[in-house]
């Protein structure tokens, strides 16, 4: 039984009985209070109803108490503060959670959500001009784990990578590859400032030389550019796909910006928005602090993004008359919406924080307020070694690419550590501490808990085969799990689905990592307590029944840790 869902449904039923109102009760929350003295679960239903009915929250709370106290799983109810209803749940109800995890895991993880939503998450979208820089890893992991969470709770999710293959950086890439091609033909070259000096493009020049000889030099410039561009972009995308695959990340769609130009999607989108009265010709005022004489005050085609909360209207053309990057964003959003997407999520780096309002404006306009949009910013990662900052520069011989760091610490450590802080907060990644086998290393701490549960079962099979066989046959008395430490762990296990639901609701994958660290901590504490107090050991040779029950507890811990690591994309370890 999912106790959070069960209590929510019973509150809705009580609301229907008391106030003939189910819809408003759907907005009520069921949370775990921060302080134990406020009970096990708490709801704000009384304050929601009171605001609607214009009556006292405590009066409403008392009416709910009269009905809900009769529920068989409720031990007591207290009214606190302005009208919070705090519930204490009977111990046997928590103990049933162990049985549900072991015997009905799929049903236990069921979450009551609107599963009709079609969600598109765009993340990474690095320019295809070279190996993926480690700076992209946080957004890559955040986006990928968020997609996994949303899929886990039942949404249909598309993971998308927007390929920026139509801008000036691609022109610079082509120019560099052509120089490497000439070099492969025997010319002495110099890579000018502003191009890409990395050695990773040398093999591309060699491949072109082997395939074309000097034929590319004989072609007209436009034909040569097209051939080299298609070749270089595809090779760089292959490189990026491999970097992502090595992190356990696979996108469903790689969408080409160039395709928007090729099929005149930008023109069509501008025509649509013009018909909606959202495109006009005007002069943008200079930004604050900018002198008028230094500002380009030409007449431009502008999108009325201020209609939707943006700080200024946005140009859709550059000074030379070509489409702006913003114009591509307009057409790209329309393409997604035309595919039937009902919720767009953009995951951007810290350097794109200024794009939030303009992207929201685009989707609100094209989606006609029917399509949801969220723009999530991932702050910078500061790499350190024992607390000392590491300069992420290839020229200095330090880590620069995803491949470098992946080779040094492995994908599982990268994925977990990128979730040890909320995405909009800077993160310190200590390249030394993440490899330590200590409590200070969260990924080790969680994996060690998983390994310990396996060790408990293995040892029980050897030392107490009767207890182990009874556990395997589901012959255990869960009421024996009654100590304060055991109940605390069981309550945390029972809140796993709530953690998943909250992570999905607020787009906060770090909650999964935090939950796993908390669960591992409580488990290790009980294990260590058992070293000094034999009654708390998981295997007690003089008490077969309690041992059988604790094998069930250890297995439930193992299953939930494995489930959490699976959501994060980390392989649970069986031994260390």
Swiss-Prot record:
Pfam assignment, any one? DALR_1
GO molecular function terms noted in the UniProt entry: arginine-tRNA ligase activity; ATP binding
* Keyword entries, A-Z: Aminoacyl-tRNA synthetase, ATP-binding, Cytoplasm, Ligase, Nucleotide-binding, Protein biosynthesis
Catalyses: tRNA(Arg) + L-arginine + ATP = L-arginyl-tRNA(Arg) + AMP + diphosphate
Please give the SUPFAM superfamilies that the UniProt record associates with this protein. Answer: Anticodon-binding domain of a subclass of class I aminoacyl-tRNA synthetases (SSF47323), Arginyl-tRNA synthetase (ArgRS), N-terminal 'additional' domain (SSF55190), Nucleotidylyl transferase (SSF52374)
Q: One Gene Ontology cellular component annotation?
A: cytoplasm
RNA-binding as UniProt keyword: no
GO BP, sorted A to Z: arginyl-tRNA aminoacylation
Q: What is its main location?
A: cytoplasm
Q: Origin, by domain of life?
A: Bacteria
- EC annotation from Swiss-Prot or TrEMBL: 6.1.1.19
Q: Where is this motif: 'HIGH' region?
A: 126-136
User: Does the keyword Coiled coil feature in the UniProt annotation?
Assistant: no
- Family matches, as CDD domains: ArgRS_core (cd00671)
Q: Which family does it belong to?
A: Belongs to the class-I aminoacyl-tRNA synthetase family.
**Can you name this protein?**
Arginine--tRNA ligase
Q: Which organism is it from?
A: Rickettsia akari (strain Hartford)
The lineage is: Bacteria, Pseudomonadati, Pseudomonadota, Alphaproteobacteria, Rickettsiales
């Amino acid at each position: 039984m999912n106790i959070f869902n069960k209590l929510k449904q019973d509150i809705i039923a009580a609301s229907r009985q008391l106030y003939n109102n189910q819809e408003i009760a759907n907005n009520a929350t069921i949370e775990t209070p921060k302080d134990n003295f406020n009970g096990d679960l708490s709801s704000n239903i009384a304050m929601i109803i009171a605001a609607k009915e214009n009556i006292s929250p405590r009066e409403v709370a008392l009416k709910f108490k009269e009905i809900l106290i009769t529920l068989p799983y409720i031990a007591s109810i207290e009214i606190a503060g302005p009208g919070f209803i705090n519930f204490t749940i009977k111990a046997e109800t928590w103990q049933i959670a162990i049985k549900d995890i072991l015997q009905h895991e799929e049903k236990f993880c069921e979450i009551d959500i609107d599963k009709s939503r079609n969600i598109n998450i765009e993340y990474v979208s690095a320019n295809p001009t070279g190996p993926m820089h480690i700076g992209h890893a946080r957004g890559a992991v955040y986006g990928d784990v968020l997609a996994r969470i949303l899929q886990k709770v039942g949404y249909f999710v598309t993971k998308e990578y927007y390929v920026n293959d139509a801008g000036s950086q691609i022109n610079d890439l082509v120019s560099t590859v052509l120089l490497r091609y000439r070099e492969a033909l025997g010319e002495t070259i110099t890579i000018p400032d502003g191009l890409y000096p990395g050695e990773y493009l040398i093999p591309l020049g060699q491949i072109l030389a082997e395939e074309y000889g000097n034929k590319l030099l004989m072609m007209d410039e436009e034909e040569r550019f097209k051939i080299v561009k298609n070749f270089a972009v595809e090779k760089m995308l292959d490189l990026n796909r491999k970097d992502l695959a090595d992190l356990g990340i696979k996108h469903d769609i790689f969408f080409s910006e160039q395709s928007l130009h090729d099929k005149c999607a930008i023109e069509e989108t501008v025509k649509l928005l013009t018909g909606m009265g959202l495109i006009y010709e005007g002069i943008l005022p200079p930004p604050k602090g900018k002198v008028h004489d230094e500002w380009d005050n030409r007449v431009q085609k502008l999108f009325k993004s201020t209609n939707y909360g943006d700080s200024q209207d946005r140009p859709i053309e550059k000074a030379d008359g070509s489409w702006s990057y913003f114009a591509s964003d307009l057409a790209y959003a329309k393409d997604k919406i035309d595919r039937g997407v009902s919720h767009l999520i953009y995951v951007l780096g810290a350097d794109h924080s200024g794009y939030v309002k303009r992207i929201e404006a685009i989707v609100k306009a094209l989606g006609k307020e029917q399509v949801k949009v969220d723009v999530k910013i991932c702050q910078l990662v500061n790499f350190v070694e024992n607390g000392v900052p590491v300069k992420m520069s290839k020229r200095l011989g330090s880590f620069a690419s995803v491949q470098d760091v992946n080779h040094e610490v492995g994908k599982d450590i990268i994925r977990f550590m990128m979730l040890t802080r909320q995405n909009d907060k800077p993160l310190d990644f200590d390249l030394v501490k993440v490899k330590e086998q200590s409590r200070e290393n969260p990924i080790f701490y969680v994996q060690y808990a998983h390994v310990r549960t396996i060790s408990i079962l293995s040892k029980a099979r050897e030392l107490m085969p009767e207890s182990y066989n009874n556990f395997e046959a589901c012959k255990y008395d869960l009421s024996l799990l009654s100590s304060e430490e055991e109940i605390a762990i069981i309550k945390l296990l029972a809140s796993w689905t709530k953690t998943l639901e909250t992570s999905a609701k607020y787009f906060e994958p770090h909650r999964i990592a935090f939950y796993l660290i908390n669960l591992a901590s409580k488990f290790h504490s009980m294990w260590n307590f058992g070293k000094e107090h034999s009654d708390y050991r998981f295997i007690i040779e003089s008490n077969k029944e309690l041992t059988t029950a604790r094998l069930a507890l250890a297995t439930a811990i193992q299953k939930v840790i494995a489930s959490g690591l699976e959501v994060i994309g980390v392989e649970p370890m069986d031994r260390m």
